[in-house]
Amino acid sequence: GSSGSGKSTMLKCVNLLVPIDEGSILLDGADITASGVNANQVREEMGIVFQAFNLFPHMTVLDNVTLSPRKVHGVRKAQAEDKARELLAGFGLSDKVDEYPDRLSGGEQQRVAVIRALATEPELMLFDEVTSALDPELVAEVLNVIRALKDEGMTMVIATHEMGFARDVADQVCFLDEGRILEHGPPKQIFSAPSEARTKQFLQRIIDAGRL
């Protein structure tokens, strides 16, 4: 959807940061918006990555990645560091373990942000326009990380303006407009045969801009 259509708000609703007005949100078949649900416990099942990298500038890459597992989940320091090093190596950042964020490129910082979210071993990953703050040449770095997560079977909800990426990676695509899910379905349906006039208009503008 276009800017202001409600993509970020939807992700915040899934993460229980914004209350929903009606309906329900199911995670593993359980309604996480039901009365009495512990929001903090639900959030422990999710990882979320925003547009801004939000790394702690006074901490090394290793400390950024291990902070939540240690402080929130009670993982022993040695175990958390072993897991962090494994993740960093898997995403080509093993040589950045002791670096501080200001020594990293934007693409590297965003990859560390993704790894930090993965370090808590979430059931669900939420991505909110994670490439929008990156130079175009760095976008592929982060998109390749998300592709790798898909190949590993990670469940993800992604808000993105990278239409070609969404078409290639998604199992289901939702088009949002003015705070509503106007249309949803498999990528082939949404991108090749959308039923709503607003969806068609949006996609045509993307095509005209050479972004699809």
Predicted regions located by residue number:
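ABC family nucleotide-binding domain
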Residues: 1-178, 182-187
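C-terminal boundary and immediately downstream tail of ABC-type ATPase nucleotide-binding domains
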Residues: 184, 188-212
